[in-house]
């Protein structure tokens, strides 16, 4: 049986024992039904793993003994910041989960003119928390030991105006360049913009051009927003990252 991987939000360096977070304790004790003496693998976002053993377990809390600390780097050398216009239903959750599995480092939910999702500030805050939990669960599943950040919602034009040394890319069905024709990726990585189901407006496309985005083509077919993001990330990781290594 595979040893369960559990995220711990506080640094475990130099710790010999700790209580799991409330969410983790509930998962371990109630869902997995694990008891004293069973093994876990903890990670705290530092790119290390911590073999651990349960020493106390009840309905309210789980206490573990830390048995060691090991560097376990599963990160791609290609840094990808995904700017994803929020989509309806479970599509956004699916995109976040699979993007994390494919190696994205940061995800910023975006609002655009044709975005069909309308949420007030309180509901959006709850969504961000939910999406961060999905990112954590994806790391637990895929073996990553650094949890990607889910940033607060931004307007598309504000996100496009940010400059962090990354190559800015925007998918466009009539672009003249493909991912294969891109130059060497800079040390700042890639800032990848994915629009909503309705695409970007003419004004938003003009804004991306003004902010230095390169339009790229991803095949001859029109892809749904959740397909486009995952296809683009996969292609980038194959050409410039660690897929296929």
From Swiss-Prot:
One term under GO cellular component: cytoplasm
Keyword Methyltransferase: yes
GO BP term, example: rRNA base methylation
Top-level EC class: transferase
Signal peptide: none
Record GO terms (molecular function): rRNA (uridine-N3-)-methyltransferase activity
Catalytic activity: uridine(1498) in 16S rRNA + S-adenosyl-L-methionine = N(3)-methyluridine(1498) in 16S rRNA + S-adenosyl-L-homocysteine + H(+)
Coiled-coil positions: none
Keywords for the protein's UniProt record, in alphabetical order: Cytoplasm, Methyltransferase, rRNA processing, S-adenosyl-L-methionine, Transferase
Primary localization class, coarse: cytoplasm
Location of the protein in the cell: Cytoplasm
Catalytic activity, EC: 2.1.1.193
Pfam families: Methyltrans_RNA, PUA_4
Biological role: Specifically methylates the N3 position of the uracil ring of uridine 1498 (m3U1498) in 16S rRNA. Acts on the fully assembled 30S ribosomal subunit.
Protein family per UniProt: Belongs to the RNA methyltransferase RsmE family.
PANTHER family reported for this sequence: 16S RRNA (URACIL(1498)-N(3))-METHYLTRANSFERASE, RIBOSOMAL RNA SMALL SUBUNIT METHYLTRANSFERASE E
Official protein name in the record: Ribosomal RNA small subunit methyltransferase E
Organism for this UniProt entry: Haemophilus influenzae (strain ATCC 51907 / DSM 11121 / KW20 / Rd)
Lineage of origin: Bacteria, Pseudomonadati, Pseudomonadota, Gammaproteobacteria, Pasteurellales
């Amino acid at each position: 049986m595979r040893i369960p991987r559990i995220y711990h939000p506080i640094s475990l360096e130099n710790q010999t024992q700790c209580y799991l977070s409330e969410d983790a304790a509930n998962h371990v004790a109630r869902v997995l039904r694990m008891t004293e003496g069973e093994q876990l693998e903890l990670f705290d976002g530092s790119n290390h793993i911590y073999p651990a053993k349960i020493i106390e377990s009840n309905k309210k809390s789980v206490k573990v003994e830390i048995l060691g600390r090991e560097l376990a780097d599963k990160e791609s050398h290609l840094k990808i910041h995904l700017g994803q216009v929020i989509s309806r239903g479970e599509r956004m959750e699916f995109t976040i989960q699979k993007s994390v599995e494919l190696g994205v480092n940061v995800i910023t939910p975006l609002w655009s003119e044709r975005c069909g999702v309308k949420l007030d500030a309180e509901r959006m805050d709850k969504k961000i928390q939910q999406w961060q939990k999905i990112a954590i669960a994806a790391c637990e599943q895929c073996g990553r030991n650094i949890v990607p950040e889910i940033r607060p919602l931004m307007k598309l034009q504000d996100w496009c105006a940010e400059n962090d040394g990354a190559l800015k890319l925007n998918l466009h069905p009539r672009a003249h360049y493909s991912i294969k024709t891109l130059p060497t990726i800079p040390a700042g990585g890639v800032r990848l913009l994915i629009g909503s189901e309705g695409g970007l407006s003419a004004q938003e496309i003009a804004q991306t051009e003004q902010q230095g985005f390169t339009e790229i083509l991803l095949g001859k077919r029109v892809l749904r927003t959740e397909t486009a993001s995952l296809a683009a990330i996969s292609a980038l990781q194959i050409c410039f990252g660690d897929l296929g290594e």
